[in-house]
Amino acid sequence: MTNIRKNHPLMKIVNHSLIDLPTPSNISTWWNFGSLLGLCLVIQIITGLFLAMHYTSDTLTAFSSVTHICRDVNYGWIIRYLHANGASMFFICLFLHVGRGIYYGSYTYSETWNIGILLLFAVMATAFMGYVLPWGQMSFWGATVITNLLSAIPYIGTDLVQWIWGGFSVDKATLTRFFAFHFILPFIIAALVMVHLLFLHETGSNNPTGIISDADKIPFHPYYTVKDALGFLVLTTLLLTLVLFSPDLLGDPDNYTPANPLNTPPHIKPEWYFLFAYAILRSIPNKLGGVLALVLSIAILAIMPLLHTSKQRSMMFRPISQTLFWILVADLLTLTWIGGQPVEHPFIIIGQLASFLYFFLILILMPTCSLIENKLLKW
């Protein structure tokens, strides 16, 4: 009798990806975030689909349609808050996943890494457009401020902004197209995830030591399916705790006020997961310079493989690099804090120092210390 799992054209793909996949025996909990991101994406697509059934992308009715979802639709409130806070969980997992990649040198799988950067940009774009949809004050002004940044591009900037807006300001046309893009992008992300996994399975997973583990592999199922199931349980517990006890903890109170083009909120700021990039943007007095720094704060990940000067792949046995890595984490937390503060002393100078340190650490300090560690190996 033929084994369907191993011979059926579709089941074979699933089998090689999730069941019989040879996996390093020593991968830690830091390797759980890939599957957790998959879970987040599924949650976002399902909750988003149900929200889209009741949402209207018109400036006159968008805000009331979200209110209607929360008040009148069966379990609409929990679907809405699962979607809003699901985005926060998505970004927590994303940041930890990227951090893991940097710490353990996973970026040396350059194809997988580059698709990952594309995914990061796509998720950020999706989250930004999703934040505009409820059409509250912060939605409107956030959209105005961020899209306006494109006007810093020389020569074509102003035309580009008006083209994206579909007029001379953020209005009905902008909201409709943002809804269309917000709906389609998660499916593009899902397709990119498949490519991400395709490239990953070409090489096999990295492991905490950074040493080739071909001699010591175990099947993905049951070992890592059980481990992932525990991760799913922890993530859903955290998400449900957030949704059921303090759903507005990570949101902005200003977004409960309908959008008003004639009234600017005192502090325009994005969701918490964009604050580090927003702080880098604000720390440069020049508009074009700020926009470039904003893009580079994420795009810099693409040159990570080129900046890897160490003879060892992972930071597991490199204490100096480990110290710098955790300084980088602290720096990003500082930037996140600064991004939420008003533009005044002492926050301006702290933001500028933290932004400088971010690029200085990645571009100069970390590669230099890797070279020093190479020398120390010979002592």
UniProtKB/Swiss-Prot annotation:
Domain of life assignment:
Eukaryota
Could you tell me what the cofactor note in this record states? Answer: Binds 2 heme b groups non-covalently.
Q: Where does heme b b562 bind?
A: 83, 182
Any one Gene Ontology molecular-function term assigned to this protein's record = ubiquinol-cytochrome-c reductase activity
Its membrane topology: Multi-pass membrane protein
GO CC annotations?
mitochondrial inner membrane; respiratory chain complex III
Principal place where this protein is found?
A: mitochondrion
List the SUPFAM superfamilies: a domain/subunit of cytochrome bc1 complex (Ubiquinol-cytochrome c reductase), Transmembrane di-heme cytochromes
Q: Which residues form the signal peptide?
A: none
Q: Tell me, what's a Pfam family for it? A: Cytochrom_B_C
Cofactors required: heme b
Transmembrane stretches in the record are: 33-53, 77-98, 113-133, 178-198, 226-246, 288-308, 320-340, 347-367
- Indicate where this protein resides in the cell: Mitochondrion inner membrane
**Which additional comment does the entry carry?**
Heme 1 (or BL or b562) is low-potential and absorbs at about 562 nm, and heme 2 (or BH or b566) is high-potential and absorbs at about 566 nm.
Give the record's subunit note. The cytochrome bc1 complex contains 11 subunits: 3 respiratory subunits (MT-CYB, CYC1 and UQCRFS1), 2 core proteins (UQCRC1 and UQCRC2) and 6 low-molecular weight proteins (UQCRH/QCR6, UQCRB/QCR7, UQCRQ/QCR8, UQCR10/QCR9, UQCR11/QCR10 and a cleavage product of UQCRFS1). This cytochrome bc1 complex then forms a dimer.
User: Which family is this sequence assigned to?
Assistant: Belongs to the cytochrome b family.
Recorded protein name is Cytochrome b
Per the UniProt record, the source organism is Ochotona hyperborea (Northern pika)
Q: What is the lineage of its organism?
A: Eukaryota, Metazoa, Chordata, Craniata, Vertebrata
Q: Which gene encodes it?
A: MT-CYB
